[in-house]
Curated annotation (Swiss-Prot):
SUPFAM superfamilies: MFS general substrate transporter
HAMAP family: MFS_SotB
GO cellular component: plasma membrane
Protein name as annotated: Probable sugar efflux transporter
Record family assignment: Belongs to the major facilitator superfamily. SotB (TC 2.A.1.2) family.
Protein localization: Cell inner membrane
Gene3D superfamilies: MFS general substrate transporter like domains
GO molecular function, a single term: carbohydrate transmembrane transporter activity
TM annotation in the entry: 15-35, 50-70, 81-101, 103-123, 136-156, 169-189, 209-229, 246-266, 275-295, 301-321, 333-353, 364-384
Length: 397
């Protein structure tokens, strides 16, 4: 059975299963954001110290994305996905059992290894498995899976953690991954590696100034976002003085707004990707500047979160579109680099938020995050003027 002869129904089932896998991988990366206070309590540690777990995870993904992608470039993709899921599930069992914080961090490193490879191959696999002429929709489904991790995965993970303990959240993610693995084994055909690129692709990509500029923009804007977002749960409870339940609601609003951002980008992204990204970054700057003033009431924080969620989703989707358009000849290498760079930003933001919370005041995380966000806004305007044509999305062939 090949990808060319299967029915459209089976082809879509394969893409949907990949989207569910994307949902699970993104949920586990972000779910600690909603569990920091609970994990800190169980290990009798300050919340800001537990937050270093976010930085370690993100930087392991950043460092290992490209090396692991190159090491596995010749491995048949179905077998590779199965191996990734086995590592992913085993690491979640270890998270569930973690008897101290060090063991929890080790388990998260195992998950990060699986994550590093998964995100470097997923976009190209979705395109290969999609029904004819439906490549853009397949990528959109993967993006939806990613968005739903913020909308449903993170808040549900937090609710489970609130009522049953954070260990149960990690165990439940492992069970979800096991079910997805069974579906992948049943649905996926053999998928020989193709168009994955190699080390030879790197000098070629590094000689593309427009692409390098997008990578730089990505790391700066993601650092800005995660400086505040990584600590939003303790911020709501300790700075704003609001309830743990409202922290859950706020995460739900932030994620739900991401779906609106996804719809907006889906409608306008093909024609207006560049101005949309700049407008979204400007919106991010405003939201970060207003984070502390908005902490005076639940309604103000809720409204701010809607605009924040829309902005970060448009930014994330826009960056992916730019990278894929600028590196159609080495998508796996380009996306592995993108995943790595995105995670450098996550780790840097979480680290900055950690240091600000420990040595200054958690109340200022919005103001501190707004500084790189403003730099990103200026840089986006410069590069979209410098490369107006080459940065637009190339048409699907």
């Amino acid at each position: 059975m090949t990808t060319n002869t299967v029915s459209r129904k089976v082809a879509w089932l394969r893409v949907v299963t990949l989207a569910i896998a994307a949902f699970i991988f993104n949920t586990t990366e972000f779910v600690p954001v909603g569990l920091l206070s609970d994990i800190a309590r169980s290990f009798a540690m300050p919340t800001a110290q537990v937050g270093i777990m976010l930085t370690i995870y993100a930087w392991v993904v950043a460092l290992m994305s490209l090396p692991f992608m190159l090491l596995t470039s010749q491995v048949e993709r179905r077998k590779l996905l199965i191996c990734l899921f086995v590592l992913f599930i085993a690491s979640h069992v270890l998270s569930f059992l973690a008897w101290n914080f060090t063991v929890l961090v080790i388990s998260r490193i195992g998950i990060a290894f699986a994550h590093a490879v998964f995100w470097s191959i997923t976009a190209s696999l979705a395109i290969r498995l999609a029904p004819p002429g439906k490549r853009a929709q397949a990528l959109s489904l993967i993006a939806t899976g990613t968005a739903l991790a913020m909308v449903l995965g993170l808040p549900i993970g937090r609710i489970v953690g609130q009522y049953f303990g954070w260990r149960t959240t990690f165990f439940a993610i492992g069970i979800g991954a096991l079910i997805t693995l069974v579906c992948l084994i049943k649905l996926l055909p053999k998928l020989p590696s193709e168009h994955s690129g190699s080390l030879k692709s790197l000098p070629l990509l590094f000689r593309r100034p427009a692409l390098m500029s997008i990578y730089l923009l990505t790391v700066v804007v993601v650092t800005a976002h995660y400086t505040a977002y990584s600590y939003i749960e303790p911020f709501v409870q300790t700075v704003a003085g609001l309830s743990a339940n409202f922290a859950t609601v706020l995460l739900l609003i932030l994620g739900g707004a991401g779906i609106i951002g996804s719809v907006v980008f889906g409608k306008l992204g093909n024609q207006y990707a560049s101005p949309l990204i700049s407008i979204a970054i400007m919106l991010l700057v405003i939201c970060l500047m207003l984070l502390l003033p908005a902490a005076d009431s639940e309604s103000h924080l809720a409204v701010l979160s809607i605009f924040w969620g829309i902005a970060i989703m448009v930014i994330g989707l826009g960056m992916q579109v730019k990278v894929l358009a600028l590196a159609p000849d080495a998508t796996d290498v380009a996306m592995a680099l993108f995943s790595g760079i995105f995670n450098i930003g996550i780790g840097a933001g979480a680290l900055v938020g950690n240091q600000v919370s420990l040595h200054w005041s958690m109340s200022t995380i919005g103001y501190v995050g707004a500084v790189p966000a403003l730099a990103a806004l200026v840089w986006s305007i410069i590069i979209f003027r410098r490369w107006p044509v080459s940065l637009e999305e190339q048409p699907q062939h």
